[in-house]
Amino acid sequence: MVLIRVLANLLILQLSYAQKSSELVIGGHPCNINEHPFLVLVYHDGYQCGGTLINEEWVLTAAHCDGKKMKLQFGLHSKNVPNKDKQTRVPKEKFFCLSSKNFIKWGKDIMLIRLNRPVNNSTHIAPLSLPSSPPSQNTVCNIMGWGTISPTKEIYPDVPHCANINILDHAVCRAFYPGLLEKSKTLCAGILQGGKDICQGDSGGPLICNGQIQGIVSVGGDPCAEPRVPAIYTKVFDHLDWIKSIIAGNTAATCPL
């Protein structure tokens, strides 16, 4: 029986794919080194998440990725052979939709992090654009991260893996996730046939559609990549006003209802 879970390895999510004998994921591939300058590795106390650089001083990730002694790495591709322009920062401030940090509430799994100092744009570090409009159904989008590449074993790659998935009708997710509201501020995305999905270790990572961040990895099935069990992503477009207000200095801004 497939169980619902917050895709976290003790508070974290990761991309998940079934493996081929070549050690590549089914339907996915190791990301090109120049394919993800906005991708952030968020980690604390042995846990890891993904994140997205949206300007030189701000990162978007999932609320359930929060933790003490958090660090963020930028410009990272291979964990074993870091790029020369890799940079590390820590949070200066964190902002959440709910003061209780109750990220389980659909559409509230979002955290905006202000860095202790801006990063310097470089060959492997550059921000990703916020959405200009929401994605339509059947849009092909990209997921990526250093998460486990097996749905049944925790096998973490040295470099992030990338795969394409589709924006699906919200009804597909509502059929599996009890309590998911029709108008919740989330996106339903995946492959109905299974085989490509997010999994443990990539919570907070981006769902990228047409060169813009449209979603934040939030919740998925267990095991990962099961047929007709897509994942849920916090919908960035519905939080644009909140994000822009916080960045502009209005720290009292409230999230959409």
UniProtKB/Swiss-Prot annotation:
The keyword Glycoprotein applies. InterPro entries: Peptidase_S1_PA, Peptidase_S1_PA_chymotrypsin, Peptidase_S1A, Trypsin_dom, TRYPSIN_HIS, TRYPSIN_SER. Disulfide bonds join C31-C162, C49-C65, C97-C255, C141-C209, C173-C188, C199-C224. Pfam families: Trypsin. One of its GO terms (biological process) is proteolysis. GO terms for cellular component: extracellular region; secretory granule. Keywords: Disulfide bond, Glycoprotein, Hemostasis impairing toxin, Hydrolase, Protease, Secreted, Serine protease, Signal, Toxin, Zymogen. Belongs to the peptidase S1 family. Snake venom subfamily. This is Snake venom serine protease KN2. It comes from Trimeresurus stejnegeri (Chinese green tree viper).
